[in-house]
Amino acid sequence: MLHFDNAVSAELLLELASHAPDTLRWAIRYSKLFERTASPLWLALRAALVGGEWQVFFGVCDRLLDQLKPFDELIGNAEKQLEHLSLLELIAYLSVLAYQAFAEDAPDDRSGQQWQVYNRIILRKLRACPEQDFRLNESRLGQSLKRHLSPVIFPESSTADAARCRENLEWLAVLIAATQERIDYEGSIDWFCFDPECRYQLKPGELVIYNQSEAGTERWQRTGRKSDLLWHYWMSRAVQAFVNSGLAEQMIGSPENHELNQLAYIKAMRSELQLQQIYGLGHRRSLSNGTQVQLHHVLLASELTSVFFQSQFIQPFQDYLRESGVLAHALGRLAMDGMLSGENRFPMTWSEEEEKIRRIKGWTVSEEHPRGSADSAKAILRFWTSDLSALSQQLLKQQPGMPAPRLYEQPFYKIGRYSFQFPWVGAQQNNLTAAINNLRRVNARRADVQAETQRVELALAESLRQRGFAVEVGYRPPVTEEDDAGEVDLICQRDGVLLLMEVKSGYIRSTTHEVWLHR
């Protein structure tokens, strides 16, 4: 309730403070009320609660927010220096710096922090974009790349152009670093808000927040180990399904890419198994415009895209970087090789919709369409595409319940008539997580979600029956004047033991805040 200023009165909260102060303090932490410093509720509580424990609590909240101010100043200053860049130009510079992650001495980024930073920078840019940034045609595309990308990767560019681009890259590096620092510190605030082991204090020379025990950390690590074991389980099932299908005895694609293509097929089968058995999806996906596409083709396209970007972009770039030791030179050689072979090997790729469909079509071969299906390819492109103009409008309107897609969740980005991709995302993204979050986070309001959840409940019920349980699915206790218990997903009984199960089938969460909301 504390997310909304008009959901509860300050008087009621003050009454709660007098009887259960710890409960109210946890409610403030869970709701992050203290981040809304101008909230009438927050101001009323601060004015009325003057006891020592409350003053320490308010002081800790202030200290946590004060730490964000230097980062916000750096971010604001860097954005001001870069505001003359169009959306396309900013993305071009981001794509250059993104390749630093593929250097041999680059630190591991297992949590995807780099993508979080780039995602936030792009979303903030989308909130400030003029409409003309989305009216992209061939002329404007060429002019922008000539002024802002060519001088970086081709050394024969003029000195003035190169100096201007170097200055833009330097300011963007400042923006990236400051945004990274802010996101890191937001993790500390989430720790304070959602970790039941987190305690706080205001003592000179001591940390403001600390853990009473390591139970929360150990629980998080244990969950990670479970996730790793489940990954191996589903991959093992997919390998067996791949062998049973007869594909293991066939050449897939060119001989040099055969092993990578095999792995792509196995991963697609793994994802299909999980989506069907855990998330209740069928063999075909219905899109919002009524078109349908095979789920396997949707998943296979993303896996083969990763193979393509890894083999044609990342590996050659790393070879060139080892030779020259200079990021720009390596990117220039990669781009030049592409031009000599008639291919786009720039740090980001783009083409019009028909060209994208033509390339994807070959991945939709089936008995029904032995040469592939253009309609299926178009549906796949639609499924994986984020329309940045529409997203900009959504962000400006601040529509509740409409989450913005993350970079990897919809890795085709529509600007004007062009579809863009980032090889530095596509080559290393987790395509299963991308598919799940596309379906269950970005498109959580799909009409099919309820039917999918019912399939999960029925499949789980059947599995339990095979193990000797008596199972009732979807039981609704009678509604009384005093109470409405709602639906009980599964009631299971065996050997005198009764289990009441609530089936939850959401998206893949990556932060303590998201996990807490799920619970």
Located regions from the model:
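Anion-binding and metal-coordination hotspots
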Residues: 483-486, 503-505
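Residue-level detector of functional hotspots within protein domains
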Residues: 455, 476, 489
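A short acidic/basic microdomain associated with nuclease active sites
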Residues: 462-483
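Nucleic-acid nuclease catalytic cores
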Residues: 519
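Short acidic, glycine/proline-rich loop/turn micro-motifs
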Residues: 511-516
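Active-site beta-strand-loop-beta-strand hairpin of nuclease catalytic cores
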Residues: 492-510
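Short acidic loop-to-beta-strand element that houses the catalytic metal-binding Asp/Glu
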Residues: 485-493
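Acidic, metal-dependent phosphodiester-chemistry machinery of nucleic-acid enzymes
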Residues: 1-451, 458, 462, 466
